[in-house]
């Protein structure tokens, strides 16, 4: 007999007994109603207790059946599954629940242990240990921020001074908007995230953003939150020294409000040099004259050996002096026969024009803008007649420039309209 059938039969017997008692003693209707309601409540309580006892009994039986299985050994697990399947006294539903409980026993044990530790709010010695931005001057924080608190990751519940410290140590990313708790490093008290500690009343950071859960106690840094970007950035604020460009999808200096060229979601990509995602990077991002972004640190290293944008190959620094040297070198070193009869069809990376020019090992000059930043499309050889197509000749057009990269040049950023932005803080 199933449990539901048993309870149904029990209720019918109880109802018959109540009718007999009513007919014998002829109780008043209102009194009978009160007694019936009280009996129903008692019956529900008994049923609940009965179910709890029944579940406890089943759990004990399950533990006895699953005793001895080693989840790390496939043979042991397979043997136990066959044993459960062969138990004719168990229903198919009970067998399925048993196998599920066996396979999830390790996870359930971890959850119970983790929940217990979380409920007791136990903090390890490493959690309570203070971290410093500058240990000599006793400025609390980490290598990334000045702050007086630690944050708890919503996913792993571990404590770190900032999201960067967490991301460097863990295999997942800390989502700052999801942070709920902070640990004051002054009084070592856990509490909801806020700018001030509710126990010692100390300020956790001069700047605090409740949306990003960002604390920064650096007195020399100004920060603001941009709702369109969805993050905090370095600066005095929108309308003061920055504006948000809807097309580019980021905040730009007000000085380039009327001059910058819009590229949709321009920083929603990785840096072409180091590969780091630029939209929320802490590194300063600059925009080249062609409006392509990259990290300022990467740009400074890159232009030591290259003069072209890594994305579109346009010239990004002033190399006019090198072009003049190339003019003199090409004039001084004429090509020998039969190379002096060859004609190159070139495409200019700076002005995108196509033209024909004399072939030379050192480089090919654009007839429109006089730039040597060109690439060969094809070469016409009068002695052979057929025109040999070269989809991409990676060395010929740069041979002369590589020889001259050791020379100095005027790399003034003003001539090439390079400007920078402070990104995610």
Swiss-Prot record:
What name does UniProt use for this protein?
Uncharacterized RING finger protein C2F3.16
For the ligand (Zn(2+) 3), the binding residues are 184, 187, 197, 200
Q: Which residues bind Zn(2+) 4?
A: 209, 212, 225, 232
Zn finger residue spans: CTCHY-type: 204-270
GO biological process terms, alphabetically, are: proteasome-mediated ubiquitin-dependent protein catabolic process; protein ubiquitination; ubiquitin-dependent protein catabolic process
- Tell me which UniProt keywords the record has, alphabetically: Metal-binding, Zinc, Zinc-finger
Q: Which GO terms describe its cellular component?
A: nucleus
ZnF endpoints (RING-type): 271-313
Record: residues binding Zn(2+) 5: 226, 229, 244, 251
Among Pfam families, the record links this protein to: zf-CHY, zf-RING_2, zinc_ribbon_6
Zn-finger region bounds: CHY-type? 135-202
Which positions in this protein are listed as binding Zn(2+) 1? Answer: 142, 144, 162, 165
UniProt-annotated binding residues for Zn(2+) 6: 245, 248, 260, 262
Q: Which GO terms describe its molecular function?
A: ubiquitin protein ligase activity; zinc ion binding
| Binding sites annotated in the UniProt record for Zn(2+) 2 | 153, 156, 166, 172
- Per the UniProt record, the source organism is Schizosaccharomyces pombe (strain 972 / ATCC 24843) (Fission yeast)
């Amino acid at each position: 007999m199933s449990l539901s059938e048993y309870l149904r039969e029990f209720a019918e017997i109880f109802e018959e007994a109540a009718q007999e008692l009513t007919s014998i003693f002829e109780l008043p209707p209102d009194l009978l109603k009160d007694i019936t309601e009280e009996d129903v409540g008692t019956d529900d309580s008994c049923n609940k207790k009965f179910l709890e006892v029944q579940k406890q009994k089943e759990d004990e039986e399950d533990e006895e059946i699953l005793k001895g299985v080693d989840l790390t050994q496939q043979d042991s697990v397979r043997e136990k599954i066959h044993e459960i399947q062969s138990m004719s006294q168990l229903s198919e539903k009970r067998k399925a629940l048993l196998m599920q409980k066996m396979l999830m026993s390790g996870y359930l044990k971890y959850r119970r242990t983790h929940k217990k530790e979380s409920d007791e709010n136990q903090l390890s010695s490493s959690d309570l240990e203070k971290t410093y931005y500058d240990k000599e001057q006793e400025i609390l924080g980490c290598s990334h921020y000045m702050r007086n608190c630690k944050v708890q990751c919503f996913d792993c519940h571990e404590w770190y001074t900032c999201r960067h410290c967490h991301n460097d140590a863990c295999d997942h990313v800390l989502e700052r908007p999801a942070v709920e708790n902070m640990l004051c490093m002054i009084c070592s008290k856990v509490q909801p995230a806020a700018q001030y500690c509710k126990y010692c009343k100390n300020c956790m950071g001069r700047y605090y953003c409740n949306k990003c859960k960002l604390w920064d106690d650096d007195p020399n840094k100004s920060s603001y939150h941009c709702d369109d970007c969805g993050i905090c950035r370095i600066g005095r604020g929108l309308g003061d020294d920055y504006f948000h460009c809807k097309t580019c999808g980021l905040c730009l200096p007000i000085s380039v409000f009327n001059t910058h060229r819009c590229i949709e979601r321009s920083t929603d990509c990785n840096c072409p040099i180091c590969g780091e995602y630029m939209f929320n990077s802490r590194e300063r991002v600059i925009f080249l004259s062609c409006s392509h972004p990259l990290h300022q640190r990467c740009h400074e290293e890159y232009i030591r050996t290259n003069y072209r944008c890594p994305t579109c190959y346009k010239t990004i620094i002033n190399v006019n002096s090198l072009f003049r040297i190339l003019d003199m070198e090409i004039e001084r070193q004429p090509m020998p026969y039969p190379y002096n009869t060859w004609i190159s069809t070139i495409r200019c990376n700076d002005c995108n024009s196509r033209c024909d020019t004399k072939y030379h090992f050192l480089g090919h000059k654009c007839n429109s803008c006089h730039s040597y930043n060109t690439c060969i499309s094809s070469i016409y050889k009068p002695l052979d007649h057929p025109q040999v197509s070269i989809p991409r000749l990676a060395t010929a057009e740069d041979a002369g420039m590589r020889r001259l990269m050791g020379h100095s040049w005027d790399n003034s950023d003003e001539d090439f309209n390079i400007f920078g932005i402070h990104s995610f803080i």
